[in-house]
Every structure is written in C-alpha cells, then in structure tokens.
Amino acid sequence: MRLLVFADLHLDAPFAWADPEVAQARRRALRRCLVRICELAVAQRCDALCCAGDLFEQDRFTPDTAAFLRDTFAQIHPLPVYLAPGNHDWLGPASLYRQVEWTDNVHLFESSALEPVTLADGFTLWGAAHRAPANTPGFLDGFAVDRGGVHIALFHGSEQGELVFQESGKVPHAPFRAAQIPAAGLHHALVGHFHTPRDAAAHTYPGNPEPLAFGETGERAAVVVDVDGSGAVARRRHRVAGTEVHDVTVGLDGVAHASQVRDRVAAALAGLTGTARVTLAGEIAPDVDLDVADLHEVAPHLDAVVTRLGRVNVAYDLDVLASEPTVRGQFVRDVRDAADLTDEQRRRVMVTGLRALAGRRDLEVR
C-alpha cells in the first residue's frame, strides 16, 4: 500500500509579514504547491492521497479557492483523496468542505471520532475531523481498533512529546502520546498540525509543504509512505515547495555609514531566491543612520526582503563623552552613576538618550 501524505498547506493564509502584493504571490504559490502534490501522487503510483488537516484557512477562504480545490482533486480522479479536517479548516456548517460538490474520489472524514475506511483487503485507514476551531480532545483517547489487518490513522493533532521539537506558541490541539498509537492497535499515524517535519517510529508529521513563515526548519515536502502487509512503513520525502524562505543574519561590526550597511546586506542576499528575513546585529559607529526601511529594495532579485533589528550596539566612547562640559557629558555621567539601573538598563538608557540628544529618529534599542 502506497500513500502520499501532506498537511498544513493553509491555502488563503494571510502572510501578515508581507505587503499585499507579496502576500498574494505567496497564496498563489500555495496553490501551485497543491498541484505539484497531486502530480506527485500520480507519478509515484500512489494508492491514495491523504491530507492531515489545515488544507485551507476556514476564516479566509474564497469561493475561488473552493472551485480550485474541487477541480484540482477532480483532475487526479479516480485516485482516492482522503481529507481529515484540522483546527484551521475545521468542519462546521459554513465550512468550505460543505460548499463543494466533490467528485467521488474525494472522501471527507466528518466524525469527531476515528472512523474506518477500507483501502484494500486487509488495510484500513482511520480518520477524524476537528468539528470546532479549538478544544478538540485527543482522537486516540479511549480508541481501539476492532478488526484485524493493517491499520493507519489520519488526523490533525499534537503529540505531546514533540512539543520540544516544534515552534514555540503552538497550541496543543487534539493532544496524544506516541505510545497511544500502538496501544490502540494502530500500526502508524499520519498527522498534521506541527509544521516541523518529523519521522517518528509510530507517526509521521509531514510538515507544511510550502514555506509559510520565517524560521522554519526541515525540508518542505510531501511524504510517500509505503506500508507492507505487516504494518511496517518506509518513508521518502519529496520536495514540493516552489519557493524558498531564508533567515539571514548580517553582522554590522565596524560599520561607519549607512551605505556600508546596504552593501553588507546586498552581499549576504546575493545568490538567494525567494524571500529573505534579514536580522541586523553588531556594533556600529555612533553616526550611522540605521533605517531598516532603506533596505527593502537592496535585493531586487528576491520576491521580498523583511528586515529587523537584532542586537545592535553603538560604539560610543563613553569615557570621552563623560569628560565633556556639555549636557551630553552630564547625561553620560548621570546614567553611569545611577545605582538603580542594571547593566542592560543602563546600556539602553545611555544609547537612547545619546541618540535623542543627537536628534536621531532611530531611538529603538535592542
């Protein structure tokens, strides 16, 4: 039995970090990714295509997206498509899933409890749906298979032992423990929700197949899962992302003027494709007018550049400044003598005050 599994595509995602034009381009990229996934399922001669939830954003989908999904899955007919709604594409009365007249190769899991579908003689797929955007209990709680053969689960949930591997702030929807999978009589679980890919002994998180945010790790892929008659699985990840998202840190030590900042950022981004987030860090001269807005056009070959300040320090000679018979000198002396400030607070007050006294606009201190 050969299955292709993906999850967390998030069609119609807002891409709040991008301007409207770039965000729309990213949403088009998500659609192209789904087409590649379907083509891969056909090319790999899979017995079924499985989506483990968050196919789209329920609170943002458009009628055009509904038509796109129907036609995309219809084009691979008669290849079966199994959909297990997650917390972002949860199954409710107003769901996109309810508004589409799907072709007969599409099977939508609708129950909040795992329900069986026979894939072939001796092979059963168990799937379930989130029926609300939050507070969905674990699908494996109290569950046990009730028949012989090989059993695979498809759902959207949070393996509690995986939390240390996943991105911070991820809400544990439909929580479960890996040990519950074999204890329930399942041979393997295909799971969505966590965006970091993970191939564990009893379960697979494919991760989001197309980049959604900065800081993502692991290859953006769909997973071909071969299941033999004993229930053993073999997995192969296939890259399906059409674009790349990069996190780049640019060191600013020794920078004396703004043009050098631009040059360093341009050099760091040369040869990259897609979208990049640049984090600026290091020690710069006091007179450098650092404005991240000036860097957005530094790499026109990229789809977008998002720039942020990391730990940027200003190389003030405080001993020289403290010796001045000026307002600035008195300020430096007062901050140095302030006993109620921690070293970090003193640094921030010093830099902010000196910038303000110089008439600078960039008062934010990291």
Language model: regions and residue ranges:
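His/Asp/Glu-rich metal-coordinating catalytic cores
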Residues: 48, 57-204, 208-221, 226
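A generic secondary-structure signal
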Residues: 36-44, 72, 142, 264-268
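Short coil/turn segments at beta-strand junctions that form active-site/ligand-binding loops
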Residues: 1, 45-47, 79, 149, ...
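Domain-start "cap" segments at the beginnings of catalytic or binding domains
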Residues: 1-22, 220, 226-248
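Acidic/glycine-enriched edge-of-secondary-structure segments
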Residues: 21-28, 124-127, 243-257
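N-terminal active-site segment of His-dependent metallophosphoesterases
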Residues: 1-67, 147, 347, 351-366
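Accessory, non-catalytic peripheral segments of nucleic-acid enzymes
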Residues: 231-366
